[in-house]
Amino acid sequence: MSDLLRVIQALRFDGDYRETLRGIPAGAWGRLLRLTDEAQLTLPLALRCAEFLPEDVRTRVQSDLARNAERSQRTMAAYDRMAAALNARGIEFLILKGFTQWPHYCEDLRFRPQYDIDFFVAPGRVHEAAEAVGGLGYEPVRESRGPATDHLPTMLLRNGWRWRGDYFDPEMPPMVETHFRFWNEDRELFPVSGAEGFWERRVFREIEGRSVPALCEADAFAYATWHVLRHALHGNLRLYHVYELAHFLDHTAADDAFWSECRHADAAAMRLAWEWFKPELHAAARERMNALPRAASRWFDVFAFSPALALETPNKHELFLHLCLAQGWRNRARIVARRLLPTNPPRVEKDPHVTRVDLRMQLQRMAFRVGFLARRAVLHMRSLGPLALGGVQWWRAWRRA
């Protein structure tokens, strides 16, 4: 078992498996913490498993908790300024995910990782909303190229902050995404149901003394499952988001009222959360998971942990799940081509918060971009072998499905 899978096992909800962490060699923790930082599992590890960690690791993650608590306060203050700017223009909005996940997805908002604030804006006013946020000093990270996915280009505060490898830096300003739809069927190549009523069913939630517009509980869970599924299928899943789903499933296992209203949550995302963290399930959740198409269900039998293992060894096994969910052979061919021959890699920029861009910074950014693309190419090539081997496994499993 890989060390990362030991962490996932230690965070399960169906028993106490924390003792497994003692099997991780002392010298492996440095690399492992870099993985859990990236996967956003460091904070739940600190909260639930501190006494099973080596002393130096425990000291480090307890410091992470304290600094994230300060980050959380600053994030809420940033939200207050943005909300005031939108309200001043009479722009209606709601918040997706983020701090509206409390309390069902996390025990304490101070210890939830959050790096951006996601607004969904009233139809027809998304550009005006971005302009209002821009009045606070936020600018698009990059100019939009081609059709957007679900939101306008990400915006950030150009205040001179620089990334130093610290995921819990209180000085790190949150980024902003302004959404105009909940699901992009043209991009994902299969539909989901229920999004057309999300806006009308929005509610206000009391969070740390403020009234925050948000999705109603059933719609918020549905959107959270779609979010996990979308990122899983594109190979950029944050493991913490799966943990949050498991936390929610475990805490609503006896909530008949909720499950009588929850009609649009994605069963594949719930199955992933159950496979990893084994939450207790309401009968309705289990019934929906059992209703997955046979081929998709078989994928979990073979590749359930592949999205987590991909942090260490790229594999692209999520491609086979996407093929199960997509409709029509033409769409499936598009998915295969998109994953095997990527033509639009993510655009990144070194120190995007820096305000003064001189020739030296331009050269540094160019070198960073070249290095990033080279690393992406290497990761892509490394994934092809495991993908081919997985293809053989999948073909055999699919024939038995």
Which functions belong to the PLM regions below?
Residues 1-115, 121-401:
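Conserved NTP-donor binding/palm subdomain of two-metal-ion nucleotidyltransferases/polymerases, i.e.
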